[in-house]
Amino acid sequence: MTVLLTAVGVWCTVEARSTSASAAASNHALTDQPATAEVTSAISLTLNKIFSYTYDKTGVTENAAATLLRGHARESYEKLFAQVRTMAPGQRLTLASRVSATSVQQLTENNAQLLVFLDQSATRGNSATPETAAAQLSVTAQRIDGNWYVTDLAPR
């Protein structure tokens, strides 16, 4: 009986370690620093572009989003930005966004899950004092033909 319990214990330990080892090994965010840096850079640049605009040049931001977003992210963004396009000129709204921190939570060859923190500064009209805010986003990205695209965005 003791031998059987010991054997079961050893087997469970080996299985648990092999499962966690293979899960960690398949997450390139833990094992491939250059790939992690690449997706971090690409997604940071994307978010800086699509969440920054001036009331008189919203088309520049919309064009960037059309190029850099895919799938659900693009659909959601288009709905949100329709409101911006309508309201920003009347308020003379300018928004500057900058990614302040990024955590790549999961990374495979062509897919990534990231947690991103944005610092945002909005100026309305002739106000000299910007309003500042922070945002957290869960981002899903996909590599297509060697380029990273945001495919889903969700506030956290």
Regions found by a protein language model. Name each.
Residues S97-R98, T132-A134:
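Short solvent-exposed loop/turn micro-motifs enriched in small/polar/acidic residues
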Residues G125-E131, T151:
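Solvent-exposed, non-transmembrane alpha-helical starts
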Residues Q91-R124:
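Surface-exposed, charged secondary-structure patches
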Residues M1-N48, S52:
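Juxtamembrane and targeting peptides
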Residues L5, Q106, A141-R143:
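Short, low-complexity Ser/Thr-rich regulatory SLiMs
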Residues Q113, A134-R156:
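Short beta-strand edge/turn micro-motifs at domain boundaries
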